[in-house]
Amino acid sequence: IEIAHSLCLTERQIKIWFQNRRMKWKKESKLLNSSVQSAGEDEEKPTE
């Protein structure tokens, strides 16, 4: 509520902003985890 007042926004706008940030963070962390795992799998394959 205090954040909303200080930024001259509604509580709803603040809630949506935080929700969007959480979704973006989840998406980015999922992409990072999948890229790290695929890189790790490449390293584990034996080379001839």
Swiss-Prot record:
Q: Which residues bind DNA?
A: 1-29
Question: Keywords, A to Z?
Answer: Developmental protein, DNA-binding, Homeobox, Nucleus, Transcription, Transcription regulation
Which superkingdom does the taxonomy of this entry point to?
Answer: Eukaryota
Keyword Repressor assigned to the entry: answer is no
What are the GO cellular component annotations? Answer: nucleus
Picking any one GO biological process from the record gives:
anterior/posterior pattern specification
A Pfam entry, by short name:
Homeodomain
- Which compartments does it reside in? Nucleus
An MF annotation (GO) of this entry = RNA polymerase II cis-regulatory region sequence-specific DNA binding
Against InterPro entries, the record matches this protein to: Antp_homeobox, HD, Homeobox_CS, Homeodomain-like_sf
Enumerate the CDD domains for this protein.
homeodomain (cd00086)
Instruction: Write out the ranges of the annotated region (Disordered).
Output: 29-48
Q: Summarize the protein's role.
A: Sequence-specific transcription factor which is part of a developmental regulatory system that provides cells with specific positional identities on the anterior-posterior axis.
Instruction: Describe the family membership recorded for this protein in Swiss-Prot or TrEMBL.
Output: Belongs to the Antp homeobox family.
* The protein's name in its UniProt record: Homeobox protein Hox-B6
